[in-house]
Amino acid sequence: MARKGLIQREKKREKLEQKYRLIRRSSKKEISTAPSLSEKWKIHGKLQSSPRNSAPTRLHRRCFSTGRPRANYRDFRLSGHILREMVHACLLPGATRSSW
């Protein structure tokens, strides 16, 4: 299980990303439509003044039950081994074991 501090840090990043999402999108759109290089630099400076953790690339998906950052399935928000255990226990409706 992941440390609680790592999970809280990730939640903080999610909140910051949602808060600054529109600001970052509008700034990037302004940069692409700015006619001169000096205006692009000014807009870029405004974009850089936003917090580093507000960038969407800083987010990392985590398993909501264990906090594991790797091998996550997007549809279930679970890591692989927890997903397997829950499917075997019939806790996920619609998920079946594969056999071939």
Curated annotation (Swiss-Prot):
It comes from the Eukaryota. GO terms for cellular component: chloroplast; small ribosomal subunit. One of its GO terms (molecular function) is structural constituent of ribosome. Keywords: Chloroplast, Plastid, Ribonucleoprotein, Ribosomal protein, RNA-binding, rRNA-binding. GO terms for biological process: translation. The keyword Thylakoid does not apply. InterPro entries: Ribosomal_uS14, Ribosomal_uS14_bac/plastid, Ribosomal_uS14_CS. It is found in: Plastid, Chloroplast. It holds the Pfam family Ribosomal_S14. HAMAP family: Ribosomal_uS14_1. Part of the 30S ribosomal subunit. Binds 16S rRNA, required for the assembly of 30S particles. NCBIfam families: PRK08881.1. Belongs to the universal ribosomal protein uS14 family. This is Small ribosomal subunit protein uS14c. It comes from Oenothera argillicola (Appalachian evening primrose). The lineage of its organism: Eukaryota, Viridiplantae, Streptophyta, Embryophyta, Tracheophyta.
